[in-house]
A protein has these predicted regions:
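Conserved donor-nucleotide/metal-binding helix-loop-beta segment in metal-dependent transferases, i.e.
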Residues: 76-92
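A conserved acidic beta->alpha catalytic loop
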Residues: 20-29, 71
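Glycine-rich, basic loop-to-helix element that forms the pyrophosphate-binding segment
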Residues: 39-55
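C-terminal catalytic/acceptor-binding lobe
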Residues: 152-156, 160-251
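A recurrent flexible, glycine/aromatic-enriched loop bordering the glycosyltransferase active site
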Residues: 118-138
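Short, well-formed alpha-helical segments that are part of the catalytic scaffolds
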Residues: 1-11
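Short beta-strand-to-loop element that shapes/binds the nucleotide-sugar donor at the catalytic cleft/hinge
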Residues: 93-108
């Protein structure tokens, strides 16, 4: 799957790319991308932080994390998210339709956002209920202020926690209202649904993943005073409050 992703962005010579290999031996030939091979499996949070640190050190103002089971359909995707950020003031967005979470629970179903907000200059934002970390956009400013992903999380709720921290500081839309391009599916798609492509939720690793999830769930609660979901989860916001927030951050 990685080679298909790389093929879909290989002509973007104006971008800084880094590949973090946190798995088995990886052979990447024919691409002008820097590859970092972890000496041991570090997990999601630490590996993504290596990518974020590299891009910040390269003075990138707009940063994207892309997991290897995604496919770029239109390589102008980066410009589209940057344009939307500048039009809306939202400095952290994510592709919402990897897996079933924002498709009414239906794998490979149709997008089902909670709300679509239209702006001028042909920009529209979809607001989704669930936080999905397969393709994420950040401004440099947001990362320098909030910091990187909390490495106490182990392959569960790491990106959710980070996105929540960004939301608490006003760089992202509120929890349960995660922002994406309204037409993001014109630019990107999943090669396989998250349940099929995950390397941390295989049959052999399922028990380990459950243990990590429970520990990360408890750590999330100790950190924020609420859980990532459930009866004592992060409180939802009303649509009116979300719209008021969007007005306050609009440039």
């Amino acid at each position: 799957m990685l080679n298909k992703l790389l093929d879909s962005i290989k002509y973007r010579n104006d971008c800084e790319f880094i590949i973090i290999n946190d798995g088995d031996d990886l052979e990447v030939e024919g691409y002008n991308f820097y590859v970092r091979n972890n000496m041991e499996n570090l997990g999601v949070a630490k590996s993504k932080n290596l990518a974020l640190k590299h891009l910040l050190n390269k003075d990138c103002d707009h940063i994207f994390l892309i997991e290897d089971d995604m496919l770029i359909k239109n390589d102008q995707i980066f410009e589209a998210y940057i344009k939307a950020s500048k039009a809306t003031g939202i400095q952290h967005m994510m592709f919402g339709y990897h897996g079933p979470a924002n498709k009414n629970g239906i794998s490979k179903g149709e997008p089902h956002p909670r709300l679509v907000v239209k702006y001028s200059d042909n920009v529209s934002i979809a607001l989704n209920q669930h936080c999905v970390g397969a393709f994420c956009y950040y401004t440099r400013k947001s990362l320098e202020d909030v910091g990187l992903i909390d490495e106490n999380f182990k392959n569960a709720f790491d990106h959710v926690s980070h996105s929540y921290e960004l939301a608490l500081k006003g760089y992202s839309t509120p929890y349960w209202w995660w922002a994406d391009l309204a037409n993001s599916c014109d630019y990107i798609e999943e090669q396989a649904c998250s349940e099929e492509s995950s390397t941390i939720k295989t049959k052999e690793k399922m028990e380990e993943w459950r243990t990590n999830m429970y520990k990360s769930y408890d750590y999330f609660k100790s950190k924020f005073g609420v859980t990532p979901f459930g009866y004592d989860g992060v409180p939802d916001q009303t649509e009116d409050n979300v719209l008021k927030f969007l007005k306050t951050i609009k440039p």
